């Protein structure tokens, strides 16, 4: 698989964003744009991208600001350079436009994971007419404490600064996720090898800065704000998937609540699935072949 790595300049603030492009060997049947999760990077999706390219899909994935190579220095991991969430959302909008320029007249599919689903849902509110299908994988469900969390984060920023790696907010947000599990970050995946690689990767699992947490909480609040949905593409096919043992979805009731929230906004073509025995990173589970196949079926139907 040939990977073309490029830099594009964010139209929001001039930050350099690193983008990887993969073309299939046969004529492309569609384009999959990715929106990755928190405290990880684009390279973790290359196995799935290889699978999609073998089935005729071109793929475009960038490192979100504050992640991977979309930082000014390694010390900026978890720092977004702004507290305006429109920047990370419109970065995605720009990458979708970039993908369209590379592969004109092809359907655009958006695959998003975890925090990336918050970005894609905020993107959806403004730009749903730009894409042809949407996958939400491991999506955070509604947390009604998001507003309070923003206030706490701003207060913490007054004392510690915006670039402070905020262990307190990290514990408040994720402290319960690993309950009952032995290995560090075992909540992300039942596949022990995946967890081991994640823990050994310096571009994964870093603690967000206070600025990063403010952005995260704002994304959560905006994604579940009932106001501001244009719904220009009401019949957009949406596929919502998660592991039954994923703490990010909280529970099945909250997961079903997310699906209902999108239906209530006006989207009428939503399917969902929970995978038994799987945790947060469906693409990296031992039985990921089933997930790969299900997503592919959704993309091609």
Residue ranges of each PLM-predicted region?
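Active-site glycine-rich loops that stabilize anionic/oxyanionic intermediates
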Residues: 36-40, 115, 244-245
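Conserved alpha/beta-hydrolase
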Residues: 44, 49-75
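Alpha/beta-hydrolase fold nucleophile elbow
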Residues: 103-114
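Alpha/beta-hydrolase-fold enzymes
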Residues: 120-203
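Short beta-strand/loop motif that positions the catalytic acidic residue
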Residues: 240-242
